[in-house]
Design a protein with these regions (language model features):
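Short, glycine/charged-enriched hinge/interface segments at domain edges or termini
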Residues: 2-4, 54-138
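Short, low-complexity N-terminal leaders and the immediately following helix N-cap/first helix
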Residues: 1-63, 115, 131
Length: 139
């Protein structure tokens, strides 16, 4: 039996080191990166909604609860003020989560009223929020 160091030495003697080359992205199929890819920013750059619905405080997600709708936020826009308890903001997929909100109530789980929304008796408990940097982080 040989030692670990001897076995490692034998294995490393079989390794062929190769140079790297720069190629266009179109020519990179089935190739391996020679250096790490480093991002200059987080993606997404802020918490975003994963579904169409209403941005709310998680504590407000209670069956049959009425919430006022105080505005709307779409992808590429923002909502100026913070959400308070008992309030919601109409939100669409990819839109930034308004300040004060930490969950999305999907639209299928609500009943639209003139004065706001009511949460259905049975509703999805998930938050439906894509956290800042969940795809990749800077660095």
């Amino acid at each position: 039996m040989i030692s670990f160091e001897q076995a490692l030495s034998k294995l490393l003697s079989l390794v062929e080191y190769i140079d790297f080359e720069e190629v266009k992205l179109e020519e990179a199929h089935c190739r391996v990166l020679a250096v790490d890819a480093i991002s200059s920013r987080d993606q997404p750059p802020f918490d975003t909604s994963a579904m169409d619905g209403y941005a709310v405080k998680k504590i407000d997600k209670v069956p049959n609860k009425n919430l006022s709708v105080i505005g709307k936020v779409t992808a590429g826009s923002s909502f100026a003020r913070s959400i308070n308890k008992g309030e919601s903001v109409r939100i669409f997929t990819g839109a930034p989560m308004p300040k004060g909100s930490n969950s999305v109530l999907i639209q299928e789980d609500t009943i639209q009223l003139e004065s706001g929304i009511t949460i259905r008796e049975k509703f999805e408990k998930k938050d439906f929020v894509r956290k800042k940097g969940c795809d990749y982080k800077a660095g």
